[in-house]
Amino acid sequence: MQGNLTALLITSFIVLSVVLIGFIAGRNKSSRSSVEEWSVGGRRFGPLLVWLLVGADLYTAYTFLGLTSTAFAAGSIAFFAIPYTIIAFFVSYFYLPKLWEVSKKHKLTTLADYAKGRFDSKFLSLLIAIVGVLMLIPYIDLQLAGIQDTLTVAGTGYINIKVVVIISFLLVALYTFFSGIKGPAYTAVIKDILVWVIMLFLVVSIPIIHFGSWGSMIDKIVTDSPELLTIPTTGPKGIPWFLTASLVSGLALFMWAHAVTGVFTAKNADVLRKNAIYLPFYNIVLILVVFLGFAAYLVLPEGSDPRFALLNLIQVSYGGVVQGLAYSTIALASLIPCSIMAIGASNLFANNIYRDFINPNVKPEKLTMITRSMVFVVIGLALIFGMLFPTALVSLQLLGVSGMVQIFPAIVFSLFWRNQTREATIIGLLVGLGVTFAVYSTGKTFGIYEGFWGLSANVIALIVLNPLFVKKAKDKTNPIMDQLFTK
């Protein structure tokens, strides 16, 4: 399908304008004066900015394109995104404020930093850092795929898609290197305003354009495609998969390096409590986006590629101006999360791999420069990986969720369980990762989400083995444990 020049020009103008704002956000040299300033903004962000930043971080182009694609191809299974985010925000209310207080006092910028201090274990820190970096690469690639798909629909016949994608991500790498977290934080304001305005406009107008009203669209779904509105009771993605995927994804959400980067920018713990209450409002958009997938199923020709369901639906529904606004929204929902993900991955590598194992005596100024420079390496690796293995991205990201949730017991349990031991935690993490990869490799999930098997094995190993090492742990203390457990 031929692109639309007007839509392409509007998309390009908005994206380049936002990138420019990203550079302007870092004009003050203090934004890159230290790792803490560059990666978490000196922990000075208030409730609204954290809400917008975490929203920009978690609700990506993959969220919107992936949800409509899943709804288009598999129906109501796409609704699993709703309970999983609610689980994530509900649980986070109880542990993120405590984690933030520890990170603030001890100047921690990654979960691996916390694990090292809590358990006095560089090895556990290394494990968490490696898992965090490796799992983020395909996630960054999915953002690349999001903007590539957007440009394919908007710009076919006018531009070289791959060249423009590479240029776009290099620009993001540059403004991230220059501005740190302040770049995506301030550009997230624009992105989130566009998401709310454009997505709400789409979900209101598309049913009217094609069916006359929302009620008529629902009637047509019920009459012509009732299977879209039900979840299978059995099979590889039935109700057991839906429930376990929601639980695992919810627990994993704030284990991602980019998610916790947004969390650590908060100026106090109360900001995080407020965000746990108000972030679920984003689910209003998600629910409606799923119905756009249903609309695409009814409107687009049979045999259409589910991957392009939302983009093609926009293309057949509107003229160039609205297309451009919609495409730019999706493009920004790719680029801004990519920036935050690159910060998270760079931070893990520089602090928990380079500083702890390669150059322990590195000076703070050099460490800051290495952390910032790693942005180019991370985004470069993501670009290469995405071009070499384009069909593996979604499955690897889903595996990434199952991998990241294995960190949950090491981080969250240890905030409340004083006698949790280093040895049992490490063994549990390794067992969880091993079981997850074994289930994923064999494909024998028995209708359960892969990560659930791994997390179950992880927790069982931790609980069973912890008593073997607990005697030494009872007599042990360190500054983080003193803060957590001394009344």
Question: Where do the protein language model's features map onto the residues?
Answer:
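Membrane-embedded helix-loop-helix hairpins and adjacent transmembrane boundary segments
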Residues: 1-487
